[in-house]
Amino acid sequence: MSRSISRRSLALCVATATSLSVAAPASSAAIVNNVIEHSAADASLKLTPVGTYESGVYAESAAEIVAFHPDSNRILTVNAHAGQIDVLDASAPANPTLIGSISAGEGKEINSVAVRPDGLAVAAVQQADKTEDGEALFFNAAAADLDTAEVGRVMVGALPDNVHLTADGGYALLANEGEPSNELNAEGTDYVTDPEGSVSVIKLPEAVEAPTQADARIAGFTAFDDQPLPEGVRVFGPSGHDSKPSIDFEPEYITSQDGKAFVSLQEANAIGVIDIESATVEKILPAHIADHSQVPLDPSNKDDAAELRTLPVKGLSMPDSIGAFTAGGQTYFATANEGEAREWGIKEKDGGSGVYTDEVELKDLVEDGKVCEGALGDVNVEELADKKHAGNLKLSNASGWNEEKGCFDELYAYGSRSFSIYDSEGNVVFDSGAEFEKITAELNEPGIFHHNADNEEAEFDDRSDNKGPEPEALTIGTVGERTYAFIGAERVGGIFVYDVTDPATASFVTYVNNRDFSTDEFAAAGDLGPEGFAFVDKADSPNGEHLLIVGNEVSGTTTVYNVEDLLKADEDNQDDADDHDNEDKSSQSSHSSTATIAVGSLIGVIAAVAAAVGLLNAPGVRETVLSFAPAPLREQLEKFL
């Protein structure tokens, strides 16, 4: 674990060294003093938070999905709280500033946004009544006057929750979740309304203008209502509900590669494959199921320990974010395996007709005699049901039920606490298993880092019984010749980075968490609840560096990270060394002159660092100062520091 402060502050110190003055460090409550960093010994990448925009709105989804438009250097941040897209000027990544917004209209919400290189942007708009058809709102992200940036809208399916643009910019794809109404019928046996889930496939014009309604087609799931589904794919609901794929499948997140789209069907524990040109769902793939008798997890929030153990329980991956990429000429997609229960209705004591949910605790199934005899092997069932072991672990009663026996012969928890990589046929080629929780358990230290904390409270072990770190956000980026997956942990926070260049042998690179666990005060806690990621290639970046932009729904912050290629840094250092070794020894006078300049620069740097001696006391500052010093001076400066 290492800690760091703003790299921008240190850059200013070094850049102004020769004038013997130090610029005042930039400060932001959203970039904490002690950024958590845990990396592999051979880490090829480094993440450093450099700037943030603070909405000042907490626990209200004021910063969710993010997108970046290179030509205007603008970040588009979904502010669901206000029903708008916040437009940020990121020309200085260390200081993103709000310049305006795009509104969905009174009573409407925006759930997602994406933007094309020419500035054509599309937002997914949810109606005040979420069961009604939503809208795709098109606007010019580079418009000088954002009040007139909107160029049109088309209707899409109910509750568009995510929007994705194909790589060629030819199509906008919207995942229409089609969630049921919040209320049940008078008998409490069915939803009042439950619209179909679908994917809108919208052909886009070449210009920055809106498509017509005729350009929007719907890819639905009706064709699968009468077909057998792959094992592990779930269709379920209240007792009086007409459960079938066309209604029960709720598209969550979408990605595409080479003419095919892949959409996560979270509650169904499935992935849909869509042919984009024909706007047709071709097949349904079962999502990964973890075997926790082999892959350990931390199942208890009552044992006062960061302890992983194996259990006779399965884990439904139930993916949220999904990202496609190519490797070796083949298509793959990665998923963040969050998990999600269904819970709809209003309690009778609150004037409703009851609540439907598939969530149940392990101890309740045991105490009610609903676990089939021998189903859990030779495990002591009473011990398993103890709250300090796994009694509070949240399970789904929609899986594992043996109708003939009238009991559960398998137990299924929500989420696999991992991320997975699939090939285009749906075969799982890699899963991170227990690595996320092993890392956070290793980092656990009171007041410094709290394993399985929630995103609104920093209490240690709080989420162990309920999806653990809850991986939700995911994006793919290429740095140098390597491909990386960035995965966000919604609850404990932070970003896991894996090298997925060879998908079958993907490996952990680093974990960074810009959070202060010593406080529950939102304004001082840093980033809470990473919801959406946008990777920016250095060719498109305002500062010439790879960037990762993160929308944090609980803290309401939009934070920019520098993504440093450590492999490239190593190569540059080696080149410097080689150049030095190969210099002509006959040019001694030239060397003397260079040395004189170097010594003068060194004196300036030392003077500046001395002026900033307060910064030197902070852990991690010494290393960062050295990283900014010219290569020939580092050895001498290192001795001084």
PLM ranges: what are they?
Residues 2-30:
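Secretory targeting and sorting signals
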Residues 6, 505, 595-596:
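Structural motif marking the loop-to-transmembrane transition
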Residues 17-19, 25, 145, 174, ...:
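Short stretches within intrinsically disordered, low-complexity N-terminal or propeptide regions
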Residues 2, 7, 23, 94, ...:
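Selective for proline/serine-rich intrinsically disordered segments
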Residues 15-17, 147, 165, 593-595:
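Intrinsically disordered/low-complexity terminal segments and short unstructured peptides
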Residues 13-15, 23, 50, 101, ...:
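Low-complexity, intrinsically disordered/propeptide-like segments
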Residues 30-571:
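Beta-sheet-rich non-transmembrane sensory/scaffold domains
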Residues 27-29, 572-641:
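Composition-driven, intrinsically disordered low-complexity tracts enriched in small residues
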